[in-house]
Amino acid sequence: MVTVLDAIANAPRLRHPEKAHKPDQEVLRKPDWIRVKAPVSKGYAETREIVKSHKLVTVCEEAGCPNIGECWEKKHATFMIMGEICTRACAFCNVATGIPTALDPDEPARVAHAVKQMGLSHVVITSVDRDDLADGGAQHFADVIRAIRAATPSTTIEILTPDFLRKDGALEIVVAARPDVFNHNLETVPSNYLKVRPGARYFHSIRLLQRVKELDPSIFTKSGIMVGLGEERNEILQLMDDLRSANVDFMTIGQYLQPSKKHHPVIRFVTPEEFKSFETIGRTKGFLLVASSPLTRSSHHAGDDFARLRAAREAQLQKSV
């Protein structure tokens, strides 16, 4: 006999249960400058096969990144560790929310093997938020970094981390593993936090980035925001100043794209000209590098940007001699 419990047990899992009760938001039509081609290349298919064969998760897929076709064609992928379920529910994010599973102790080795198989000279590792773990997943991040170093020592490593909010000693564990780039995104201006990023605290994120530099000045620090969420221009400029006060080296700015009708709406599409002006202003404020365009994302062109970062630092050091 089939009961209502059987129906519930077999029902598909809601990707965003916390958003199910929210009213639908209009999804604005994208302007021409945001259109991208569907991913159909041979390189894309090969990258997808490597990811699946190692049972790995990528933020490219989970977050619905518009650049997935371009990046995967070039065998570039951003690996998302610690599962595919996040303990937070940011209004902009397409990653699934809920109760995550236990950490997989074999994941560091599988990520390292995939990095070696793909021949990556630069790799980006990110994660879901794991507020359920005592260290927020810091030791797992460190284990992944060290596994990659052991498997392919020449590969440079960039990490995009959560904020490890209220996890004493977590940041120190990650920094001790010595990633080449430490990225932690502010995501938006502080006035938007309660509605866009309610589980985080703006000035905690600023302090985290500052603390990375205090612990190891040789590590490049990086942070990014989305625009089109209702922020004012002067708020973006103040955010730039806040990042520079924390000695952040690299800033990324991209257009927010609404994943579904249940997510925060796009308030407006920022023009390419405005993005260019943010890049110019950011450079005058002292960032070593600013990437600002409608399709800019944290790990888009990360390898090329790392080379530019190193060159910019060397040029800066030469000037100070």
From Swiss-Prot:
Gene3D superfamilies per UniProt: Aldolase class I (3.20.20.70)
Binding residues annotated for [4Fe-4S] cluster 2, in chain numbering: 86, 90, 93
Pfam families in the cross-refs: LIAS_N, Radical_SAM
UniProt-listed Enzyme Commission number(s): 2.8.1.8
Required cofactor(s): [4Fe-4S] cluster
GO CC list: cytoplasm
SUPFAM superfamilies linked to this entry: Radical SAM enzymes
Localization of this protein: Cytoplasm
Name of the featured protein: Lipoyl synthase
Species classification: Bacteria, Pseudomonadati, Pseudomonadota, Alphaproteobacteria, Hyphomicrobiales
